[in-house]
From Swiss-Prot:
Part of the 50S ribosomal subunit. One of its GO terms (molecular function) is structural constituent of ribosome. It comes from the Bacteria. The gene is rplX. This is Large ribosomal subunit protein uL24. One of two assembly initiator proteins, it binds directly to the 5'-end of the 23S rRNA, where it nucleates assembly of the 50S subunit. One of the proteins that surrounds the polypeptide exit tunnel on the outside of the subunit. It comes from Erythrobacter litoralis (strain HTCC2594). GO terms for cellular component: ribonucleoprotein complex; ribosome. Belongs to the universal ribosomal protein uL24 family. The keyword Ribosomal protein applies. InterPro entries: KOW, Rib_uL2_dom2, Ribosomal_uL24, Ribosomal_uL24_CS, Ribosomal_uL24_KOW, Translation_prot_SH3-like_sf. GO terms for biological process: translation. SUPFAM superfamilies: Translation proteins SH3-like domain. Keywords: Ribonucleoprotein, Ribosomal protein, RNA-binding, rRNA-binding. Gene3D superfamilies: 2.30.30.30.
Length: 106
């Protein structure tokens, strides 16, 4: 699989699915699976039976991984989804938003 150009801590926009249009920060990137975990997006509920550690039981809510193709980096200028290009500035490789030309990092 090619390099995803999405890193932990990036602000991203969800492009499709039940959370389309929502923005969040990338909490985890799983390049081998081609998935990302975005804070506050793609929440699922897991029902837990009562146990010794958790005698009450209950429902745990947490973010599930989603396919990396469903998210795009948010443009630093206007917050809309954009593609990312890698350019060399001052001898260092930096990620640049294609829409605005703004540097995403570095």
């Amino acid at each position: 699989m090619a390099s995803a150009k999405i890193k932990k801590g990036d602000s991203v926009v969800v492009l499709s699915g039940k959370d389309k249009g929502k923005t969040g920060t990338v909490a985890k990137v799983m390049p081998k699976e081609g998935k990302v975990v975005v804070e506050g997006v793609n929440m699922i509920a897991r029902h837990r039976k009562p146990s010794q550690e958790n005698p009450q039981g209950g429902i745990d809510r947490y973010e599930a991984p989603m396919h990396i193709a469903k998210v795009a980096v948010a443009d630093p200028k206007d917050g809309k989804p954009t593609r990312v290009r890698i350019e060399e500035k001052d001898g260092k490789k930096v990620r640049v938003a294609v829409k605005s030309g703004e540097t995403i990092d570095g």
